[in-house]
Regions:
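Positively charged
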Residues: 1-186
Length: 186
């Protein structure tokens, strides 16, 4: 297995729709199986929660998504490998939350997403997969499928006042918590 290089914002592959993968050939395609293994290793190495094939310079409809348990009010979800994923939103995309991206390092932005959805696609053996996702995992799936359609999270943002560097946003958050603590003491 190998850790793959991650494409950064500005590379044209991130703005192009990815090609569907023939479900009949999934299980018997050693190149695709190696790509999946390499993407799993790359995602783990980067410490991310999702990775789409275009982010590793492969214009294929393939994503990985996970929601680790115990990370700040998040329901956990195991690693999902989805080929040709399709999403059906079951609520309006009006829940705003912070997102980052391995292709846009060190930055975060507030993005509206649906808090719930149904998904279907194929697993790495070519078998159909269906399921439902809520909360953070629904957000991750929407973010990754956007990559397959050539959409970056910044393109979904409504207010660029809520966009900035991680370090700066963490500093502002800490200052706000400290100020709130002082008011509680008064």
């Amino acid at each position: 297995m190998s850790i793959l290089k991650i494409a950064r914002m500005g590379h044209p592959i991130l703005l192009q729709p990815a090609a569907a993968i023939d479900p009949a050939g999934i299980a018997g395609d050693p190149v695709l199986q190696q790509l999946i293994d390499d993407m799993i290793e790359t995602l783990a190495d980067a410490g991310g929660v999702g990775l789409a094939a275009p982010q590793v310079y492969q214009g294929k409809r393939l994503i990985l998504a996970i929601a680790p348990e115990g990370r700040a009010d998040r329901e956990g979800a195991p690693l999902h490998i989805l080929i040709n994923p399709e999403l059906e939103l079951t609520a309006e995309p009006d829940q705003v939350g912070w997102e980052g991206c391995l292709s846009i390092p060190d930055l975060r932005g507030a993005v509206p997403r649906s808090p719930s959805l149904r998904f279907h696609g194929f697993d790495r053996t070519g078998q159909p997969v269906t399921g439902a996702a809520n909360g953070f995992f629904a957000r991750v799936l929407q973010h990754e499928v956007d990559h397959l359609d050539g959409i970056l999270y910044t393109m979904r943002m409504k207010d660029f006042r809520y966009f900035g560097f991680d370090e700066e946003l963490k500093r502002l958050e800490a200052e706000a918590r400290a100020a709130e603590g002082q008011r509680d003491d008064e």
